[in-house]
C-alpha cells in the first residue's frame, strides 16, 4: 500500500495559449488540475507513493485522469467510476499579475457525488499520512461526511492526518458554516496548515502565535502557517507544554502563476514528515517546492523531483522574514 493517501476532485485543465483572454487562444493544451491532485503529483515526483480516493465519471476526462495517474504511479485502487455524472474540468488563462483567470465546469460532477461508503473498502496498511483539504469537504454534505469518516478511520490506524483548509467560500452556504465545518476537521487533525489570512478567518484572531495557540489547544500537534511569499512558520508544544516555533524564509523567484503554490508547499511538508526531517528543514523544503511551482504556468508541471529540489535549495537565495 502507499505511504500517503489523499481524497479530492481531480480535473482536466485546459490552458489557453494566450496571455489575457480565451478569445485569443488558438490551442488549449490539456494538463491536470485539482488541489489534491497537485499534492499527489508533488509527493510522487519527490519519490514517495500516494493513493488517490475519488469518484470519476465514465467519460473522456475520467479516462485521461486515470491514464495519467496510472502512468506516473499514483495508486488508483480507491477510485470509483460512475455513469450519469461528468468528471470536472476547467479552463485557465494566464494573467500578467500572476493570478490566472479560471472557469470551472464541475457542478454535479462525479466527485461531488462521492459517498461515505467509499471508505468501507480502503486498506490503510502502510499508509503513514492522510492529506485532506477544505475543497473536497465543501462540495456537498456527502463529501464532507466522507472526508470526516476517512479521517476518523485513518486515526484508528495511527495515520497522521494533515489538513489544508484551502477555503472556497462560494462552495459553502455561509461563512459561518464554512468556519464551523473547517474547525471541526481541524480538531481531528494532527497537522493543520492554513495561510495567515485563512488562520485569521477561522480562528477570529490576528497574530500567528495566537492562531497557533487556538489550534494547539484543540489538540492539533503541529500548526504550520504559510506567510505568503515571505515564508512560513511552524508551531508545536514541547513535552512541558511550552509553545515552540520555527520560522523559515522563502526563496527569491520570478512569479509566473501562483496557482498550485500551496499544494506544492503541502507536498513538501508531507515528504519531509515521511523522511523525518526536523522542523527547519521541513519548512525549507515546503517553501522551496512552493517557490518552484510559481515559476510555471501549469498547476503541477513545475513541481520538482527530489534532485531538482536539492539543487534549488542549494543555489537559490533566500528572502528575509520575521514574525
Q: Over which residues does each language-model region extend?
A:
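Glycine-rich phosphate/adenosyl-contacting loop at the front of the ribokinase-like
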Residues: 1-74, 300, 320-323
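Conserved phosphate-binding/catalytic region of the ribokinase-like
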Residues: 1-5, 152, 208-323
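Active-site metal-binding loops of divalent metal-dependent hydrolases
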Residues: 10, 135, 165, 264
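Anion (oxyanion) recognition and catalysis
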Residues: 44, 70, 148, 152-156, ...
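Conserved N-terminal subdomain of the carbohydrate kinase-like
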Residues: 49-134, 311-323
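Conserved phosphate/ATP/ADP-binding segment of small-molecule kinases
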Residues: 157, 169-244
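Short beta-strand/loop segments at the ligand-binding rim of alpha/beta enzyme cores
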Residues: 158-165
Amino acid at each position: 500500500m502507499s505511504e500517503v493517501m489523499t481524497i479530492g476532485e481531480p480535473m482536466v485543465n485546459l490552458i489557453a495559449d494566450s496571455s489575457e483572454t480565451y478569445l485569443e487562444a488558438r490551442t488549449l493544451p490539456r494538463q491536470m488540475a485539482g488541489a489534491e491532485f497537485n499534492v499527489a503529483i508533488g509527493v510522487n515526483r519527490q519519490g514517495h507513493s500516494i493513493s488517490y480516493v475519488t469518484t470519476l465519471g465514465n467519460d473522456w476526462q475520467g479516462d485521461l485522469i486515470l491514464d495519467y495517474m496510472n502512468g506516473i504511479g499514483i495508486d488508483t485502487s480507491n477510485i470509483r467510476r460512475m455513469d450519469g455524472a461528468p468528471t470536472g474540468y476547467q479552463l485557465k488563462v494566464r494573467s500578467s499579475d500572476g493570478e490566472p483567470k479560471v472557469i470551472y465546469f464541475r457542478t454535479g460532477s462525479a466527485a461531488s457525488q462521492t459517498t461515505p461508503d467509499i471508505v468501507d473498502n480502503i486498506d490503510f496498511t502502510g499508509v503513514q499520512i492522510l492529506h485532506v483539504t477544505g475543497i473536497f469537504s465543501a462540495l456537498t454534505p456527502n463529501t464532507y461526511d466522507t472526508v470526516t469518516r476517512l479521517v476518523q478511520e485513518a486515526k484508528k490506524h495511527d495515520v497522521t492526518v494533515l489538513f489544508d483548509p484551502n477555503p472556497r467560500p462560494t462552495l459553502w452556504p455561509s461563512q459561518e458554516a464554512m468556519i464551523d465545518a473547517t474547525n471541526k476537521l481541524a480538531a481531528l487533525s494532527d497537522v493543520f496548515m492554513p495561510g495567515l489570512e485563512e488562520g485569521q478567518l477561522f480562528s477570529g484572531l490576528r497574530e500567528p502565535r495566537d492562531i497557533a495557540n487556538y489550534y494547539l489547544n484543540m489538540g492539533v500537534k503541529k500548526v504550520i502557517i504559510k506567510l505568503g511569499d515571505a515564508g512560513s512558520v511552524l508551531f508545536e508544544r514541547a513535552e512541558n507544554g511550552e509553545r515552540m516555533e520555527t520560522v523559515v524564509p522563502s526563496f527569491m523567484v520570478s512569479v509566473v502563476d501562483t496557482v498550485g503554490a500551496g499544494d506544492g508547499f503541502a507536498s513538501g511538508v508531507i515528504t519531509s514528515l515521511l523522511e523525518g526531517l526536523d522542523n527547519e528543514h521541513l519548512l525549507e523544503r515546503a517553501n522551496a517546492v512552493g517557490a518552484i511551482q510559481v515559476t510555471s504556468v501549469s498547476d503541477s508541471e513545475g513541481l520538482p523531483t527530489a534532485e531538482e529540489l536539492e539543487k534549488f535549495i542549494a543555489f537559490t537565495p533566500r528572502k528575509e522574514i520575521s514574525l
